[in-house]
Structures are given as structure tokens and as C-alpha cells.
Amino acid sequence: QRQMCIRDRYIDHVIAAAPCKLNGLKVVMDCSNGANSVIAPVILRSLGVEVVTIFNQPNGININNGCGSTHLEALQAKVVEVGADVGIANDGDADRCLVVDEKGEALDGDQMMLICALELMKKKQLKDNVLVTTVMSNVGLHQAMKKYGGSCVKTAVGDRYVLEEMLKNGYSLGGEQSGHIIFGKYANTGDGLLTAIKLSLIHISEPTRP
């Protein structure tokens, strides 16, 4: 019963981060045979998403085995095969997320962070217009943030250092190129499903946005 309570609280928490439904969106979800194998499709479907799942049969051994955010090939092929709007890949413990567009082309964490940062800036919800990144982030991310009136603060590699900087200065958003993205309003760690939902919300509001 306690496990159910924790699960239900998490479901409610993630759904609450979506101010509207995602009706009409078709998503391929690569669960990496990991922690999100059961719960991610449930949450996405409750938001109105048509979900096609792959690698959602964990057996304790096959986690991250040729699938998930470090092996996007199967996801890319499936997105094109079924005509999905987007493909989502978590890693085994579901704190990372990478995304594939409708053409099967992958977005890395830097591109995803920029999309999220610009959306928060538009809504005046990005503290000081600052995105917290690591020294591994591409210089193009910094240039793009500057172009749109924002800036990046760099930390050492590791989401723990990103979080430390966010907590120290109250920043709203931070992450790594690998797909660890932290939304300070909702969590103090990366959450692959939360990231996927936030990106999906942006997609349905601006479907032509890169």
C-alpha cells in the first residue's frame, strides 16, 4: 500500500506540471527496460498522448541494454515507422531524457535545454534569464542564449554541481548535454519524464519550432 501511495503521489506531481492535456500527440516511448517502464506510459496516456512503447519489459538484466538514451537507433527507426510526432528516450533510472523529432533526428541535452530556457524566458519564468550548464556544453548553446537575451552559468561536470548552483542562486533551469535536466520549480534532480512532458507541451503549442 505504501508503494502505491508513493507511485500515486509521483503520478499526481508529474501530471500537475502539465497545465493542459497533450491530446493528439503521438509519442514513441523508449523506457530502457528500466524504472519508467510501467509508469511513463500510464502518465502520458492520462495526458491524452497516443503512446507506442518500446523496451518496456524489464527483467533485472536487460536495463539499458542496447536501448534508452545512450542507444537511440531503435527509437529513431520506430518514430519514422509509426509516423510519431516525437520519440522520447529515458535511461534506466529515468533521470535522463533525450528526444527524437518526427524525422528521426535526435536532439541532445543542449538543444533541449535551449528550447526549455527560451520558453521560460518567454513566460518570464527563467530567473535572471540564466541557464545553468556544465563546462561540457557546446559554445553554440551559450551563443544562442546570448542572442535571445539570456546567459549561461557554467559548473563542473555532474548534475550535482548544476543543482548546487541552482540552489545557491535560485535559478530555474539547469542541466547537462547528456540529458539530465533540472526544473527547479518541480524537482531537485533530473526527471526524464518531466523533461519529456515539458518539451511535449512546447511542441503542441509551437509545432513548427525546431
PLM features: residue spans?
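Alpha-helix capping and helix-loop boundary segments enriched in small/acidic/polar residues
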Residues: C31, N62-C67, G104-D108, V132, ...
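Phosphate-binding and adjacent anionic-ligand microenvironments
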Residues: V86, K123-L201, S205
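Short, glycine/acidic-enriched loop or turn micro-motifs at the edges of active sites
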Residues: N33, G92-R96, G104, G179, ...
